[in-house]
From Swiss-Prot:
PROSITE patterns: B302_SPRY, ZF_BBOX, ZF_RING_1, ZF_RING_2. This is Tripartite motif-containing protein 64B. The lineage of its organism: Eukaryota, Metazoa, Chordata, Craniata, Vertebrata. GO terms for biological process: innate immune response; regulation of gene expression. InterPro entries: B30.2/SPRY, B30.2/SPRY_sf, Butyrophylin_SPRY, ConA-like_dom_sf, SPRY_dom, TRIM/RBCC, Znf_B-box, Znf_C3HC4_RING-type. Keywords: Coiled coil, Metal-binding, Zinc, Zinc-finger. The gene is TRIM64B. Gene3D superfamilies: 2.60.120.920, Classic Zinc Finger (3.30.160.60), Zinc/RING finger domain, C3HC4 (zinc finger) (3.30.40.10). A zinc finger (B box-type) spans 87-128. A zinc finger (RING-type) spans 15-56.
Length: 449
């Protein structure tokens, strides 16, 4: 191959973004290839849809596999390029020979005689070009790890922003349902109601401040990590000799990034005891509200419900039936009028759905959340995160998840369904009044989300 052909061949191994030999090359949908780090840095923080820096075509696929052929050829091209290793800084003072070897143990450049000395002869030594490529591989892994932290932090920041706005809406809703519940009480509790509303306002303001502070910390952390990522990217493109002398503190930096990663706020409001509420509810108590017959139930969550429960991860959240892990218990009777109260023990399950729904027990086993005239409180656990929510419309409940018995109160004539934490004597949530048009039956499903 003559020099012109060689130059053409080498040009095919150069990334058009950094104008260096490829580092961890990927080939995107349009056929153009780039260093993965270059693509991450210039593709709007790595979020899809991404546009090709060369032809501007949209690429739907967010992640690409490494082009192993390009990677190998680029590595060989780097190792065969001229190395400026004869500078005075790279001449051994003791033996006056060029340092052409790298000591893996001491992370130092050595000349031949030094590598055979008693101090180094038991260590592993590599040619500088080969050692530099090994070092770049380690740097790429560190960069991948750093980018994962970056993406996780960015997702947390987006979720934190969403939580801030949804919490504001929730606090407004909670004020209304607290006021409505006190209006239903047979005794005047004006002072207690005002105390609860004022306490709710104080707690909410504290949580809003925590969320705002968290957003600032995450934004600052993203900037630091982007700078660190760019620094590692620049280190990868250093000449071999400079690279090997500069790489000692890489792992310490990425470990520090993980340790300093801000954790998202998990906002939780106090649900205060309402004096006499359980005594009032027990006047309408229904014994054996639920049947003793358990039926395998195939639960599907509508997309808006999954989004509320799982946030930005809702597309990967479960939608399909969970098979025999899910069982439903229907009410022993359907209600068409009056007030009715019953309790269900949820102590033994983290995943459950509780409430009332249109009388459709004879329908097939497929059950979709959310549909008309289905009023549910939903508890779910994914990884180590617990979520409490309601449907119709989907709404996260920013109160502590009940761990014992949950009370359900149906006021059919006034079109309302409410949930209570029995151990606290507190209101969890009350659906806004509506008009029921069909019989409603108690429903409980566990192990279903």
């Amino acid at each position: 191959m003559d020099s012109d052909d060689l130059q053409v061949f080498q040009n095919e191994l150069i990334c058009c973004i950094c104008v260096n030999y490829f580092i961890d090359p990927v080939t995107i949908d349009c056929g153009h290839s780039f260093c993965r780090p270059c693509l991450c840095l210039c593709s709007e923080e790595g979020r899809a849809p991404m546009r090709c820096p060369s032809c501007r075509k949209t690429s739907e696929k967010p992640n690409f596999n490494t082009n192993l052929v390009l990677k190998k050829l680029s590595s060989l091209a780097r190792q065969t390029r001229p190395q400026n290793i004869n500078s005075s800084d790279n001449i051994c003072v003791l033996h006056e020979e060029t340092k052409e070897l790298f000591c893996e143990a001491d992370k130092r450049l050595l000349c031949g005689p030094c590598s055979e000395s008693p101090e180094h002869m038991a260590h592993s030594h590599s040619p500088i070009g080969w050692a530099a490529e090994e070092c770049r591989e380690k740097l790429i892994k560190e960069m991948d790890y750093l980018w994962e932290i970056n993406q996780e932090t960015r997702n947390n920041l987006n979720q934190e922003t969403s939580t801030f706005h949804s919490l504001k809406d929730y606090v407004s809703v909670r004020k209304r349902i607290i006021t409505i519940q006190y209006q239903k009480m047979p005794i005047f509790l004006d002072e207690e109601e005002q105390r609860h509303l004022q306490a709710l306002e104080r707690e909410a303001e504290e949580l809003f401040q925590q969320l705002q502070d968290s957003q600032v910390r995450m934004t600052q952390h993203l900037e630091r990590m982007k700078d660190m990522y760019r620094e590692l990217w620049e280190t990868c493109h250093m000449p071999d000799v400079v690279l090997l002398q500069d790489v000692r503190n890489v792992s310490a930096r990425t470990d520090l990034a993980q340790m300093q990663k801000p954790q998202p706020v998990n906002p939780e409001l106090t649900s205060w005891c309402i004096t006499g509420v359980l005594d009032m509810l027990n006047n309408f108590r229904v014994d054996s509200a639920l049947s003793t017959e358990m039926i395998p139930c195939y639960i599907s969550l509508s997309e808006d419900v999954r989004y509320v429960i799982f946030g930005d991860d809702h597309l990967s959240a479960p939608t399909d039936p969970q098979g025999v892990d899910s069982f439903a218990v229907w009410g022993a009777q359907a209600f068409t009028s009056g007030k009715h109260y019953w309790e269900v023990d949820v102590t033994l399950s983290s995943n459950w759905i509780l409430g009332v729904c249109r009388d459709s027990r004879t329908a097939d086993a497929n059950f979709v959340i959310d549909s008309d005239e289905r009023f549910f409180l939903i508890s779910s656990k994914r990884s180590n995160h617990y979520s409490l929510s309601t449907n119709s419309p989907p709404l996260i409940q920013y109160v502590q998840r009940p761990l014992g018995r949950v009370g359900v109160f149906l006021d059919y004539d006034n079109g309302s369904v409410s949930f209570f934490d029995v151990s606290k004597g507190s209101l969890i949530y009350g659906f806004p009044p509506s008009s029921f048009s069909s019989p409603l039956r108690p429903f409980f499903c566990f192990g279903c989300t």
